[in-house]
Amino acid sequence: DLMAANPDYVRQLELLPEDKRRAHRYGDWDALAGAYFSEFDPGIHVCPPFSLPPDWSRYRAFDYGLDMLACLWVAVNPAGKCYVYREHFQKDLVVSQAARRMLDCTAPGERVVCTMAPPDLWSRVKESGKTMAALFAEAGLGLLRTGNNRQAGWMAVKELLRPDSSGEPGLRIFGTCPRLISDLQSLRHDPRNPNDAAREPHGITHGPDALRYFAQTYLLPPGDEPVGELEAYRRALWA
């Protein structure tokens, strides 16, 4: 019996959100109904933190509003495997403060290729006549505009979560990013659109949205829309 042989496994199960705990601990698989990322498995997709090799590319991706700044740092190894190695969540920050927090949370000497942000930051602010992207740039943080097709973005996240032929997923998350891990497990399907994730409760959407911006930009060219299934689109894209 796995649980008798490995008490740590039982303790790990008790730390899961209620629906995951009921399913994996007690066999109540109906509890997972509605989970958007039902394929997300902490045993596969969460790993202990480790020292990142200096030749790995690093990126930032964030979701921003006064209600919450959610920033993720992602490293990509030469084989294309992605690791979310840092997270920062903080509310009530104006643009200049948000830019400073993201820069301050980035380790000294850490070279970040680009910072990915959603296209709504390129809308003009009435008070200044400038875009929020311009305000971020003035605060020292230039941004890369991502696509915002929600379905394509979620499909890209699911593609990264999918294990390859050797059983290795395209995305892992350091255990030191508990907020993202929890929010991914808590996200539900939109009851009106099964291909989309629910926008409520809003508090759990910020981290997954930031991951969506990264995944869509990493797998798909910004601004383009996928045609057919994501895998077919990728094959055509990289042919």
Locate the predicted segments by residue.
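Generic recognition of flexible, low-complexity loop/linker segments
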Residues: 47-49, 57-61, 71, 101-105, ...
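Short beta-strand scaffold segments in enzyme catalytic cores
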Residues: 69-75
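Histidine-centered active-site/metal-ligand motif
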Residues: 206
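Short, hydrophobic alpha-helical segments
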Residues: 214-222
